Amino acid sequence: KLRPTVTIPAGETVTLVDAAGPGVIQHMWFTGYVGHHFIIRMYWDDQEYPSVEAPLSAFFGCAYDENFVDRDGKYPVLNSAMMLVAPGRGYNSYFEMPFHKRARITMENRGDKDENLYYIITGAYQEIPAEAGYFHATYRQEHPVQKGRTYTIVDGIEGRGQFVGVTLATGMNGNNTCWVEGEARMYLDDD
């Protein structure tokens, strides 16, 4: 890229990466205001629909907007091998995202004012094994969730691959301040 920041007009989408392959995205860093109104999309090998489509902050595991703080008034931090998140200081992804022919990453500003986005996206041009998997991420939100109904996080995935994680966040309505019921269940193949 030729600049450390891009101004994204309200209601507009800009292209952050458009690279011919083969290659791999190796690291992404964003900072500044990265709230839910920024929508990141990633397309591999000229596909029509994105393999990744999510609010930028949610992609990095921050289910609430960037102003969310914990009980001590601090921003929650996610520190793992593949994601490092310190809201207000930076959002980092180290997931490798291979592509054979083309990688395209866009950012949409769904807000009502122009916003600056500070970012670095790095990778390498290299041969990619034919059987290499593509990176996918999805976003779901339901408010309110229907009482008594099972909430499905993800469904309909087919083919080989690895499930690497989920961010599940809950909020309460009214005076009820405790979420105490429910369990996470995962079904694979013919379960």
Language-model segment annotations:
Residues 1-191:
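Beta-strand-centric surfaces of beta-sandwich/beta-rich domains
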